[in-house]
């Protein structure tokens, strides 16, 4: 498997997704949802070209759906750098520096 790097913003996104899902739907769903999120991240590390290029967001970025969220990442030597994990209804441009 390729390496996985999460930016601090992406880690904060994971934490927020966990907290929201726990509060809204309970522990079991929070565990299930975040486990699937991590499985998708691991799949992308193994097969980084699965995601669709999204240069309109930022040059070099790719995106991949995971449940109601979109994983935004870029390729790095030996793996992927997960930049953000945003809800599909969010205005993506607002969340990138």
Residue ranges of predicted features:
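Short proline/glycine- and basic residue-enriched helix-capping loop/turn segments at helix->loop/beta transitions
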Residues: 42-46
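Basic/aromatic recognition patch in beta-strand/loop cores that engages polyanionic ligands
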Residues: 49-78
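Arg/Lys-rich, positively charged N-terminal/basic patches that mediate binding to nucleic acids
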Residues: 1-34
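Short, hydrophobic secondary-structure boundary micro-motifs
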Residues: 30, 52-54, 94
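Enriched for short, Lys/Arg-rich terminal
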Residues: 69-70, 74-97
């Amino acid at each position: 498997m390729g390496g996985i790097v999460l930016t601090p913003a992406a880690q904060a996104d994971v934490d927020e997704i966990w907290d929201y899902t726990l509060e809204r739907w309970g522990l079991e769903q929070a565990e299930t949802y975040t486990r699937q999120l991590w499985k998708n991240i691991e799949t992308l590390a193994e097969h980084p070209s699965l995601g669709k290029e999204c240069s309109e967001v930022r040059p070099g970025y790719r995106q991949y759906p995971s449940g109601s969220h979109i994983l935004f990442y870029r390729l790095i030597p030996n793996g992927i750098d997960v930049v953000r994990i945003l809800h599909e209804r969010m205005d993506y441009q607002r969340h990138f520096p």
